[in-house]
């Protein structure tokens, strides 16, 4: 036995159960997430198959309440259940779509949009993970529910769950003098009102229907008997579903047909045992009402078995109109988010990410834009042609100071939203000292980057290893070292003067025009590239504290890293000591704020929130390193740190008040950048500054 419909779906998908009856709204979830398929369909009229395979959604309201779809705002409402066709999909798709009563502010979250529209309500299952994946749905969506303080509260086992439960929620709480709750509507199947009246507890003289359109009388309401013309849409009948992995479903169909033959009719003196489509004999203990719709709808007359080619999948059976209603719930105020990348490998991963997100129905749609350089991406983001990009701390300084871009999401690495810059050497080179780079061969992750430029250049200035004559900082570095690979040091964006000594690119390994470029076209670009440079050509690598561990002991399958051992390398400490690479906490050159996803400062708080929601849902599905479909934080074979850092464990939203580059980078890091600006000329400090003040 499952605790909810969702537990049962999971049990069936794991071959621990076989069959379940679901309305087509929950069937949509069962199909998409748990790969369930239809097997049989409830038939409500054996004399008319066309009408017998459908029912209608209605909204019941008290007589005397001046209501229309728009005045439901801030009102208390009782729903049959989140995700159900009659109590969720049909009415909400129209309130959000053609009627436009509910303002859509968030993507991927009907509940969050509904919270902004309604007052206190009862929406059973709205706190379930299927509708509350991040646990941030607030309690007002359950305050009308009936089993507070128990495990049944606001679930499908709540006394106010289901169609009959929603009617009880409306009637009991309106007529309870001891409660301040005052619901004005119940969203249910049309036939449920007749059951409640027949069972004797629902007075039809007190209630009417709320219509989605204004009637000829000028009113938005109609009598209860007029549900055929005052309803919120026609819904395909409930389904008996099983796992799509079942290759032979005929035994299940035969079993159901056998049940129908023996137990279809009501009990009689000759057959007093059981009725398949009747629930009234099951009285709720200590409650003055009978149960309804147990396993099957009580107004079911028989089951219909569609041809296999029409029901092999949910989508083959359900009519397109209902699927259009489901899609209406997935509306997003941001139709598309454009992500900027700077090399073909990032572009390929971005396109894979876009396809993976689309497969899970995550909104907004993600598109990928390829630009030549990181600076070009910043410029296009500022000008509104793209929306998001990922930058490390040095580039965040440029993005914020020159392009007015803001950080909205940060990477987390297990130790927190930061990492450490370290200097790595081989153990077999004891003559290499942190305090003397003279004639050394250095490998640096990139010009303008925190680990490869800002922090190491500050260190050689602090230890007086260079004299910066004429304020030419880049030239001073070239005179200190014998050879280096500093990707991007020749790029016009970081060195518009063009006066760059060739030895700062002499160790680089990119082919042709790719040599010494500030992206993955240069083999020695980035944190892992700097370490690879050390293993193949250099003597000191300036990189992250995790880089050695990630690329040794067969953790990186690339050919250059296959035979590397972690204990062949050491860290150079600022005080002159050497330590093993695992002692980075006590032997590093400085702490670096985590990489961030940035956007334009003119984006509203709600736009930024929906950008975050895209990534938040994305990491729920693809945030681990074992997903066979797509891995957000893994770059696969051949490249590292594409779009996101490979060492990222999760992404976190930066609070709105802290979404500015100075607050994220902090005073210590900003002082390091200012030190370089104080000693170097414009265009010769390796930190981007626009020509003639124009970015």
Question: What is each residue range found by the language model?
Answer:
Residues 58-60, 239-241, 422-424, 596-598:
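Residues embedded in well-ordered beta-strands
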Residues 29-48, 194-229, 398-413, 418, ...:
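Ligand-binding "clamshell"
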Residues 13, 96-100, 171-175, 382, ...:
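Sec-exported extracytoplasmic/periplasmic mature domains
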Residues 13-22, 76, 172-190, 382-391, ...:
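Alpha-to-beta junction loops
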Residues 7-9, 165-169, 376-378, 529-533:
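Short, hydrophobic alpha-helical packing/hinge segments within bilobed ligand-binding/sensory domains
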Residues 83-92, 448-457:
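Secondary-structure junction motif
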Residues 2-5, 21-28, 33-34, 42-43, ...:
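Beta->alpha turn/N-cap motifs
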Residues 1-17, 22-25, 41-54, 64, ...:
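N-terminal hydrophobic or amphipathic helices and topogenic motifs
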């Amino acid at each position: 036995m499952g605790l909810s419909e969702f537990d049962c779906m999971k049990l069936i998908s794991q071959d621990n159960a076989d069959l379940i009856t679901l309305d087509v709204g929950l069937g949509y979830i069962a199909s998409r997430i748990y790969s369930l398929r239809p097997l049989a369909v409830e038939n409500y009229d054996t004399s008319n198959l066309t009408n017998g395979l459908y029912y209608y959604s209605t909204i019941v309201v008290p007589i005397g309440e001046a209501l229309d779809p728009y005045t439901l705002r801030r009102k208390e409402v009782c729903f049959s259940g989140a995700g159900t066709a009659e109590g969720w999909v049909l009415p909400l798709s129209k309130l959000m779509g053609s009627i436009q009563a509910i303002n859509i502010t968030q993507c991927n979250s009907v509940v969050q949009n509904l919270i902004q529209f309604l007052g206190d309500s009862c929406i059973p299952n709205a706190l379930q993970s299927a509708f509350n994946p991040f646990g941030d749905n607030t309690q007002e969506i359950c305050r009308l529910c009936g089993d507070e303080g128990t495990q049944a509260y606001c679930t499908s086992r709540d006394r106010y769950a289901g169609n009959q439960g929603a009617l009880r929620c409306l009637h009991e709480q309106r007529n309870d003098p001891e409660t301040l709750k005052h619901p004005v509507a119940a969203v249910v199947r049309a036939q449920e009102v007749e059951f409640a009246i027949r069972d004797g507890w629902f007075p039809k003289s007190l209630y009417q229907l709320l219509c989605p359109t204004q009637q000829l009388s000028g009113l938005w309401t109609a009598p209860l008997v007029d549900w055929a013309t005052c309803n919120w849409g026609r819904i395909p009948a409930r389904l008996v579903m099983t796992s799509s992995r079942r290759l032979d479903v005929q035994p299940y169909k035969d079993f159901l047909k056998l049940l129908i033959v023996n137990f279809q009719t009501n009990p009689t003196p000759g057959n007093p045992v059981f009725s398949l489509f009747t629930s009234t004999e099951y009285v709720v203990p200590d409650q003055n009402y009978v149960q309804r719709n147990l396993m099957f709808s009580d107004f079911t007359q028989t089951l219909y078995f569609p041809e296999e080619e029409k029901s092999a999948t949910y989508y083959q059976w359900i009519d397109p109109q209902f699927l259009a209603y489901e899609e209406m719930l997935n509306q997003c105020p941001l139709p598309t988010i454009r992500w900027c990348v700077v090399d073909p490998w990032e572009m390929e991963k971005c396109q894979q990410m876009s396809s993976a997100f689309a497969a899970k129905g995550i909104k907004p749609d993600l598109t990928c834009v390829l630009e030549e350089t990181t600076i070009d991406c910043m410029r296009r983001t500022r000008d509104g042609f793209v929306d998001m990009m990922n930058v490390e701390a040095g580039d965040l300084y440029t993005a914020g100071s020159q392009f007015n871009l803001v950080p909205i999401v940060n990477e987390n690495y297990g130790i927190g939203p930061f990492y450490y810059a370290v200097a790595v050497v081989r153990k077999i080179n004891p003559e290499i000292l942190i305090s003397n780079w003279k004639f050394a061969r250095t490998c640096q992750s990139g010009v303008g980057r925190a680990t490869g430029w800002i922090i190491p250049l500050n260190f050689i200035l602090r230890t007086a290893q260079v004299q910066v004559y004429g304020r030419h900082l880049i030239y001073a570095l070239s005179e200190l070292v014998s050879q280096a690979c500093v990707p991007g040091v020749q790029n016009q964006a970081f060195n518009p003067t063009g006066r760059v000594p060739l030895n700062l690119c002499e160790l680089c390994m990119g082919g042709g025009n790719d040599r010494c470029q500030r992206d993955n076209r240069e083999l020695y670009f980035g944190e892992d590239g700097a370490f690879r440079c050390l293993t193949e050509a250099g003597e000191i690598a300036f990189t992250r504290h995790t880089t050695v561990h990630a690329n040794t002991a067969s953790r990186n399958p690339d050919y250059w890293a296959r035979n590397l051992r972690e204990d062949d390398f050491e860290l150079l400490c600022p005080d002159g000591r050497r330590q093993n690479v695992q002692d980075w906490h006590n032997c590093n050159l400085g702490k670096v704020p985590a990489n961030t996803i940035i956007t334009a400062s003119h984006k509203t708080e709600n736009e930024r929130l929906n950008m975050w929601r895209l990534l938040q849902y994305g990491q729920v599905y693809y945030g681990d390193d074992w997903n066979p479909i797509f891995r957000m934080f893994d770059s696969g074979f051949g490249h590292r740190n594409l779009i996101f850092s490979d060492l990222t464990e999760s992404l976190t939203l930066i609070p709105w008040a802290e979404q500015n580059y100075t607050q994220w980078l902090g005073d210590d890091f900003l002082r390091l950048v200012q030190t370089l600006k104080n000693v170097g000329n414009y265009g010769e400090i390796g930190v981007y500054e626009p020509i003639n003040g124009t970015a």
